[in-house]
Amino acid sequence: MDEAKEASKSAEKFVVAKHRFECATKTEGCMCCFFEGLHDKDYYKTHIRTICGEIIEIPCHCKANVLKMYREIHSTNKDKYRLAYFIDRDFDELLNNPDFFETEGYSIENYYCSADAFSRILTDYLYVDHNSDDYRRAMDFYDEQFRMAHSIVAEFNHYYSAVKRREKNCNEKYSIELEDSFPKELGSIGVNNYRKDYDLERLNMLYGTSITQSDLDAEKGRLDVCPCLMYRGKYEIQQLESILEYLIKEAAGERNVHKENRVLRKRPKMNCIQPGQLLLVLSAMADFTQGLRNYLNKFRIE
């Protein structure tokens, strides 16, 4: 989608979100929650309702629209309604506004991809015994597969973060449109499907930038402290989906792997998650950070 069409779509979605808020204000004592995307609520809503009660969900289509909504409505409505704003940090500087919850890492998708979250997915979704050899093998498999995926996507994450920093600090603008999955022209990730077809020179040529190795090194030092949290969340969740699909299908005998060589020797009770449903299905197993808990406690009604 070109920039003009995206801007038009974003404007239309903002009008819809604004209208939804205006309708919501007819409900006395309501709590309005403004999210970036349609599926963000899949992660947030259970936590919000547990602490704050019922809510009115208002997807705004993008981060810019959540920020715009705040500018337009907050000052005149903050004393009448409970208004909560949820945004992904992405590769931007922290907003540092207490009226917002901002993810500690790149996005909510990253909260599903930590080792702790994967452990809960194994025990609470796939019903793998925490003390079993299957559990140990699956955790080792997770570590190895994410290590391999990060070896492919690391340089691109450093590069894209450097681009965002250049845009902010140098008042430059680049048109880099990213899909949800890792760009096929740059390589591939997923179990048994790792390939890297790029370097910094190719990235600069492909996207019309002039990022230097020093720029990359600066981002590397920040992002590589915890790749599962700090790398682009869409690629992290792509890798998690690949791992889960592989484990489930292999255990079901669909991978032509002898049982003695499978990661999970006991077949899980659950089937593969349908496309687009992972954030909803696994929401209870994703990390629930203290930062989010503290933010929601501000809206608690005793």
Features from the language model and the residues they span:
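Acidic, divalent-metal-binding catalytic cores of TOPRIM
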Residues: M1-E302
